[in-house]
Amino acid sequence: MAKFTVCLLLCLLLAAFVGAFGSELSDSHKTTLVNEIAEKMLQRKILDGVEATLVTDVAEKMFLRKMKAEAKTSETADQVFLKQLQLKGLPVCGETCVGGTCNTPGCTCSWPVCTRNGLPSLAA
């Protein structure tokens, strides 16, 4: 929902920009501007997917390393990952805060979006 809201806001801003300055821009400039914005939005979406994949992969490797070392500790793999890489509040849970609460387990409200306290479970 948050990504949709941001996309809608960008489209409205683009429409306002083109409407306000449209007479000063040629059709080729308008097309170039729209194409550049669309390309940047696509790149952002791709990078978000890569980031989520990397976080999950690193968490799995750290968990396996800890299992192989047979360290006797009460820390979970999520806590170790947070301490070593200082990733606090990542990744985004994929929902917006409603009344300061989040429906997804393990997520807290970091207005306007819900963020995880730790990492997604390895089964996800």
Swiss-Prot record:
Kalata-B1 is a cyclic peptide which occurs in three forms: with unmodified Trp-111, with Trp-111 oxidized to form oxindolylalanine and with Trp-111 oxidized to form N-formylkynurenine. Oxidation is enhanced by exposure to sunlight. Keywords: Antibiotic, Antimicrobial, Cytolysis, Disulfide bond, Hemolysis, Knottin, Pharmaceutical, Plant defense, Signal. Residues 1-22 form the signal peptide. The keyword Cytoplasm does not apply. There is a cross-link at residues 89-117 (Cyclopeptide (Gly-Asn)). InterPro entries: Cyclotide (IPR005535), Cyclotide_moebius_CS (IPR012324), Cyclotide_sf (IPR036146). PROSITE patterns: CYCLOTIDE (PS51052), CYCLOTIDE_MOEBIUS (PS60009). SUPFAM superfamilies: Cyclotides (SSF57038). It comes from the Eukaryota. Residues 23-88, 118-124 form a propeptide. Belongs to the cyclotide family. Moebius subfamily. The presence of a 'disulfide through disulfide knot' structurally defines this protein as a knottin. Probably participates in a plant defense mechanism. Has antibiotic activity. Has a diuretic effect. Has a uterotonic effect in humans. Active against the Gram-positive S.aureus with a minimum inhibition concentration of approximately 0.2 microM. Relatively ineffective against Gram-negative bacteria such as E.coli and P.aeruginosa. Inhibitory effect on the growth and development of larvae from H.punctigera. The unmodified form has hemolytic activity, the oxidized form lacks hemolytic activity. If the protein is linearized, hemolytic activity is lost. This is Kalata-B1. It comes from Oldenlandia affinis. The gene is OAK1.
